[in-house]
């Protein structure tokens, strides 16, 4: 499907949902769906308005809280994003997605221990949630806990062998652990899957292989 066709289809969906909102102004579901489609169309302010309306109608609408939090995270407002995800957890404490989001927020704030705690909680709730393992790998690498980073990365690759990001993160974790040959194999796999390998990392790995 062409980009033009996608825009036409989105415009059609938006028109239909706007009509539904006018007909059912108290429908949490319709406001939520319209917010998601606005976001997809790049109409961020409209998305914020509709998701906020959904939450106003139902302050326990966890999906609206999560999605509104994601918008604020993308905008760089991590405090608002954190507040919304924490509100979601008060409603549904075992919502793995919210724990992952809070981990991302903590990681952006350079609060690595807190990030690791949130990602770990997410993996306990949903053991095959690949995004949690991928992000946990990244946080453990930042903390220089290389053995644990490799373990987390292997979990991600086991769950989703064709995840380019999981392969890249495993390559990085193996590099810092000193397993350069296996790191190289995962770099090649990540590149094959379309991941844009950092040139500096690739060069550093080649230098290590040249001296090993």
Region spans (language model):
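Structural signature of tandem alpha-helical TPR/SEL1-like repeats
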Residues: 5-19, 41-53, 75-87, 108-121, ...
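Conserved alpha-helical positions within TPR/SEL1-like repeat arrays
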Residues: 29-40, 63-74, 97-107, 130-141, ...
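Short coil loop/turn residues that delineate tetratricopeptide repeat
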Residues: 26, 60, 94, 128, ...
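TPR/TPR-like alpha-solenoid helical repeat scaffolds
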Residues: 2-4, 172-176, 197-212
């Amino acid at each position: 499907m062409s980009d033009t066709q996608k825009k036409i289809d989105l415009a059609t969906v938006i028109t239909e949902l706007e009509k539904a909102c006018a007909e059912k102004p108290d429908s949490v579901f319709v406001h939520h769906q319209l917010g998601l489609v606005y976001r997809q169309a790049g109409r961020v302010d409209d998305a914020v308005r509709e998701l906020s309306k959904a939450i106003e109608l139902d302050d326990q609408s966890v999906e609206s809280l999560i999605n509104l939090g994601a918008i604020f995270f993308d905008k760089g407002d991590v405090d608002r994003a954190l507040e919304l995800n924490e509100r979601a957890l008060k409603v549904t404490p075992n919502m793995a997605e919210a724990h992952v989001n809070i981990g991302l927020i903590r990681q952006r704030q350079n609060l690595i221990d807190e990030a690791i705690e949130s990602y770990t909680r997410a993996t306990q709730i949903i053991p095959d949630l690949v995004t949690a393992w991928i992000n946990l790998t990244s946080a453990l690498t930042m903390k220089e806990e290389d053995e644990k980073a490799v373990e987390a990365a292997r979990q991600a690759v086991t769950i989703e062998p064709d995840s380019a990001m999981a392969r890249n993160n495993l390559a990085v974790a193996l590099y810092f652990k000193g397993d350069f040959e296996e790191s190289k194999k995962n770099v090649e796999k990540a590149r094959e899957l379309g991941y844009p390998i950092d040139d500096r990392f690739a060069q550093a790995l080649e230098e290590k292989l040249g001296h090993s």
